[in-house]
């Protein structure tokens, strides 16, 4: 099921900041990998948040350094924001959501850096994993996705479009959602 896109409303955001006691804004740190794409994304986020008084210190780092800083016990966590790309290489809803948002999948063993904890979300994830019926899976995972979208523990910004081509004599090449190429079934026409 498709979700309605989040709305862009600077005035509403300022109003919510005021209600939360942050009328004068605040400062935070945004971590991410030091690739050109990641730095551009983090810079864009910092520009957007500046409009509502949030001063962002963008800190691009080597991926291993980001990982070392992210995957620590909660009491040692220093994370404010993390700019990250994610895809489900296994092509399952469970793979898309469980490690990011399931209540027990927090650092240091997994990526729920929002420390999201929603019993209904967890129940839907468990029910989806427990059944082999595709219609039931679609319902449970759809419900879990709706909970995550509405709670917004992470801000889901967009989807990359992976475009690739092959020669007409090559078949069986597959590209996963994370951009990895799979040549296991590749064949060349004679």
Model segments located where?
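Short, solvent-exposed loop/beta-turn-alpha elements that line the ligand-binding surface or hinge
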Residues: 1-11, 22, 71-77, 98-126, ...
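Short, solvent-exposed loop/turn and secondary-structure capping segments
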Residues: 41-42, 93-97, 169
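A structural preference for short, hydrophobic beta-strand core positions in alpha/beta folds
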Residues: 30, 58-60, 108
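Hydrophobic alpha-helix feature that most strongly marks membrane-spanning transmembrane helices
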Residues: 50, 54, 71, 75, ...
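Append "and occasionally in soluble cytosolic enzymes with long acidic Gly/Pro-rich linkers
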Residues: 1-47, 51, 120-123, 139, ...
């Amino acid at each position: 099921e498709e979700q309605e896109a989040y709305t862009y409303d600077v005035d509403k955001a300022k109003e919510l900041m005021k209600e939360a006691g942050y009328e004068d804004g605040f400062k935070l740190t945004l971590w991410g990998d030091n690739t050109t794409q990641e730095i551009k994304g983090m810079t864009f986020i910092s520009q957007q948040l500046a409009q509502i008084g949030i001063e962002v210190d963008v800190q691009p780092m080597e991926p291993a350094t980001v990982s070392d800083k992210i995957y620590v016990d909660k009491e040692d966590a220093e994370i404010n924001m993390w700019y990250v790309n994610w895809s489900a290489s296994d092509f399952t809803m469970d793979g898309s959501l469980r490690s990011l948002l399931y209540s027990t999948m927090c650092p240091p063993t997994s990526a729920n850096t929002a420390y999201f904890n929603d019993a209904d979300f967890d129940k839907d994830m468990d029910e989806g994993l427990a059944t082999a019926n595709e219609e039931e899976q679609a319902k449970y995972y759809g419900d879990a996705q709706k909970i995550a979208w509405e709670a917004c523990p992470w801000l889901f910004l967009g989807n990359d479009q992976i475009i690739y081509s092959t020669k007409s004599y090559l078949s069986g090449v597959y590209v996963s959602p994370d951009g990895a190429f799979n040549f296991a079934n590749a064949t060349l026409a004679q």
